[in-house]
Regions:
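Short, structured helix-loop boundary elements
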Residues: 9, 16-17, 37, 48, ...
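Hydrophobic/aromatic-rich alpha-helical bundle segments in the mid-to-C-terminal region
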Residues: 125, 139-187
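Amphipathic alpha-helical packing segments from all-alpha helical-bundle domains
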Residues: 80, 91-103, 111-141, 151-155
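Amphipathic alpha-helical linker/stalk segments
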Residues: 55-85
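Basic, helix-initiating cap at the start of DNA-binding domains
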Residues: 1-31, 42, 48-49
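Phosphate/oxyanion-binding loops and surfaces in catalytic or ligand/nucleic-acid-binding neighborhoods
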Residues: 57-61, 88-92, 96, 160-167, ...
Length: 197
């Protein structure tokens, strides 16, 4: 959920604090147990640490980018405003997903992470809400067709970004459109701009 009435710096700090709480929860639940993996291979705890450190660094920036959309209501074309969001989303998911994969190979870590994510309110709605609010504000301003569902459109934009990052991680960037081209395609296919007669 969005953090009400905080300036952007405070919001970023609050997000970092929540990620740290998430990390503390994960460590407490882990109990500091060492794995019996062969020497030279990554320990499960190391993967969790790396993922949470990356999340602590990247998530506040990503949420701030989404929150800053509200400053663009009524300015420029809606699709032009969303294009850098889609590109930033692809970049964010590409970085975070690659660090997340080794973390979620353990079912128990996955369950603990889900619990911690719910408790910290850093789940998917943390990014869906600001994007939905922007689209709803543009719709109220008459710049998005009335039949558009802002929540569904926000989810579709984010899903398109996540999909590109996912495919890029598994098949490689050479087999996909560029990140810029994918961002353009994602935004274009939402068809949010009003068509002029």
């Amino acid at each position: 959920m969005a953090i009400p009435q905080l300036d952007p710096y405070q919001k970023a700090q609050e997000t970092r604090r929540r990620v740290l709480e998430l990390a503390v929860f994960m460590k407490r639940e882990d109990g500091g147990n060492a794995s019996s993996r062969p020497r030279g291979t990554a320990q499960p705890g190391q993967a969790v640490d790396m993922f949470l450190a990356l999340l602590q660094d990247r998530l506040p920036v990503w949420l701030r980018i989404l929150d800053d959309l509200m400053h663009l209501v009524g300015k420029g074309r809606v699709s032009d405003n969303l294009l850098p969001i889609a590109r930033a989303g692809i970049d964010y998911y590409s970085e975070v997903q690659s660090a997340a994969v080794p973390v979620f190979t353990s079912p128990s870590v996955t369950v603990r992470f889900r619990e911690a994510l719910r408790d910290s309110e850093l789940g998917p709605m943390a990014e869906v809400v600001p994007l939905t609010e922007y689209l709803a504000a543009e719709q109220r301003a008459g710049r998005i067709p009335p039949e558009v569902d802002p929540l569904a459109s926000a989810r579709l934009l984010l899903a398109g970004c996540l999909r590109h990052a996912y495919y890029e991680m598994f098949v490689g960037a050479d087999f996909l459109p560029s990140r810029d081209d994918s961002a353009e395609e994602i935004v274009r296919e939402l068809r949010l701009d009003l068509q002029r007669a």
